[in-house]
Amino acid sequence: MDCQQLMNNVIPVIHNPTSVQKLLDAVKVSLGFGVKTIVVTKAVGTAAQQGIPEAFRLVLKSGASLIVLPDLKDTVELLRPEAVYFLGTRGDSMGEVGGRVLFVVHASDQQFMPSEVSLGRLVRVLGRDVGSTALLTLALNRVLGSCVD
C-alpha cells in the first residue's frame, strides 16, 4: 500500500478522553502523521465540552475529518474496518497492517473493558506503560513513519 492509501486507511480512535490536553495531544500526533480521519468516542467532562471544539478546529485547519461517536461499537459498525487494534502494553504483535484499520487508544490511561476488546484485538505496542499518546505515536510511526518527511 502506498503512503496516501495508508494515511487514508489508518484511523486513530481516541476513546474515553477526560482531559482536554490528552485529547488535543492525540489529535496533534495523528495529524502530524498525516492521517485523514480521526475518531473520538465516549468523550466526557471537559474533554467533551472544551476539547472537542478545539479538536475540530485543529482538524479542519489541516484538511482532515473528525468523527465524534458515543461508543466504540458505533465506530466499528459505521466505518467497517478490516481490523481493530486496541493499543496497549500487553497482547499480540500487530503484524502487517492492510486495508482500513482502527488504532484505538484509551485516552484516560485505563485498561480496555473485555466487551470493548471483543470488537478487535489487543496489541502490544511497547512493554512499558508510557501513556496513551505515546502508544499512539509509536504505533503510527511503525505504520506511517516512512511516509512522514
Specify the residue positions occupied by each region the protein language model found.
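Post-transcriptional modification and biogenesis factors for structured RNAs
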Residues: 1-149
